[in-house]
From Swiss-Prot:
Coiled coil: none annotated. Binds 1 Mg(2+) ion per subunit. It comes from Trichodesmium erythraeum (strain IMS101). This is Adenylosuccinate synthetase. It is an enzyme of class 6 (ligase). The gene is purA. Pathway: Purine metabolism; AMP biosynthesis via de novo pathway; AMP from IMP: step 1/2.
Length: 437
């Protein structure tokens, strides 16, 4: 039995969906612990592409329970669309469960999110406009509506009538927007409730019971370490905690019940939206990585900013998350390059810095210090064992592992499940502190 957290080690979009899908075959339960429809993951199975935002990747395995935890925020319309999408492919959704403590994204959240971002002007954050931040803000203000309220008609009507009237003042007076009709919102969300009611449970208790039964549980994070509200490049972050610690808070599971943490990082670096990005390549290399890697957001469709691998970020993610091992994705994107650069440290106003700085302002002053490695001509997409990889590709992976002081357990060479090298069982080994071998 193992309880394992999968986290993003960069700015999100690292390929967590594929890695979680790969590991889900060994899991009895897959749990999503934070975020909302602002994060998307793509899974390719037998040529079929699944693009999901809220439903855990484990839904593709009929014997796996899928739980959406209390740390998430739920857009009922979107999750119903995803249920329809999955069911249309002949996949049962009876194994999907949603925490009654998860908060609900409402129409006014989306309106405020978009209007607020527009109002920021040059100081915009790069929000997806899906209402995530305002939903979490209401959670903190203790004015939010939870899933347990959604499925209670009388409670839902009472909360919506009060909250919509309150939010209308903000919409009209602050943002010059048209007010919402409380009755229309009530009717819309009552319909959502009818569809979602069978899925709403006490998720913390469900997970605890699974742990007592010694079932294998996979905790699936959204976004990445550097988008964490507390530990990311604030204010260019999300409104929740994607780091490993967020899994405990976002599911109601004690930290002593977690056995392992697996990080996921691309063989290069990307980010979406605003904020400092030391290794960003604003030249033909950046364009090449974007084109080869199909670097466009699952949620927004926005082009991702691309650059070389940043080992300073990698070391930080290993430390913050207590990472046991790492999966490196999209190694194949680097095929054919004459040389490959890796950021080993920063130059911060003339001083060498090997540790990630504590603020976005400091990070914006950092310039990458690169180590240049030889590339490889051969294609890696059909490699299924380490021995199949070009020597230079193997050396590259070893170099990354040594820089970050973390073993690499999985290497992904494409979007499909079979395009993967499993170096060692990422759930039961290797142990933290060992290097790539």
């Amino acid at each position: 039995m193992a309880n394992v957290i999968v986290i993003g080690a960069q700015w999100g979009d690292e390929g967590k969906g594929k890695i979680t899908d790969l590991l889900s075959k060994s899991a009895d339960v897959v749990v999503r612990y934070q975020g909302g429809v602002n994060a998307g993951h793509t899974v390719v199975v037998e040529g079929k592409i699944f693009k999901l935002h809220l439903i855990p990747s484990g839904i593709l395995y009929p014997d796996t329970d899928c739980i959406i935890g209390s740390g998430t925020v739920i857009d009922p319309k979107v999750i119903i669309e995803e249920l329809d999408q999955v069911e249309a492919l002949g996949i049962s959704t009876a194994n999907l469960m949603i925490s009654g403590a998860a908060h609900v994204t409402m129409p006014y959240h989306r309106m405020i999110d978009k209007a607020s971002e527009k109002r920021r002007g040059s100081k915009k954050i790069g929000t997806t406009g899906r209402g995530i931040g305002p939903t979490y803000a209401d959670k903190s203000e203790r004015t939010g509506i939870r899933m347990i309220d959604l499925v209670n008609p009388d409670r839902l009507k009472e909360q919506i009538n009060w909250t919509v009237n309150y939010k209308n003042v903000i919409l009209e007076k602050l943002y010059d927007l048209s007010p919402l009709n409380p009755e229309e919102v009530v009717n819309e969300y009552l319909n959502f409730a009818d569809r979602l009611r069978p899925h709403v449970i006490d998720a913390s208790l469900k997970i605890y019971n699974a742990i007592q039964l010694k079932r294998n549980i996979l905790f699936e994070g959204a976004q990445g370490t550097l988008l964490d509200l507390d530990h990311g490049t604030y204010p260019y972050v999300t409104s929740s905690n994607p780091v490993a610690g967020g899994a405990c808070v976002g599911t109601g599971v004690g930290p002593t019940m977690i056995d392992r943490v697996i990080g996921v990082a691309k063989a290069y670096t990307t980010r979406v939206g605003e904020g400092p990005f030391p290794t960003e390549a604003k030249d033909e290399i950046g364009d090449l990585l974007c084109d080869r890697g199909a670097e466009f957001g699952t949620t927004t469709g926005r082009k991702r900013r691309c650059g070389w691998f940043d080992a300073v970020i990698g070391r930080y993610a290993v430390r913050i998350n207590g990472m046991d091992c790492m999966a490196i994705t999209k190694l194949d994107v680097l095929d054919g390059l004459e040389e490959i650069k890796v950021c080993v440290a920063y130059d911060m106003e003339g001083k060498r810095c090997e540790d990630f700085p504590g603020s976005a302002i400091q990070l914006s002053k950092c310039k990458p210090i690169y180590k240049t490695l030889p590339g490889w001509k051969e294609s890696t997409v059909d490699c299924r064992n380490l021995e199949d990889l070009p020597k230079q590709a193997l050396d590259y992976l070893r170099f990354l592992a040594e820089l970050m002081n973390v073993p690499i357990a999985i290497v992904s060479l494409g979007a499909s499940r079979h395009q993967t090298i499993v170096v060692e069982d990422p759930i039961h080994g290797p142990k933290r502190g060992l290097l790539y071998s």
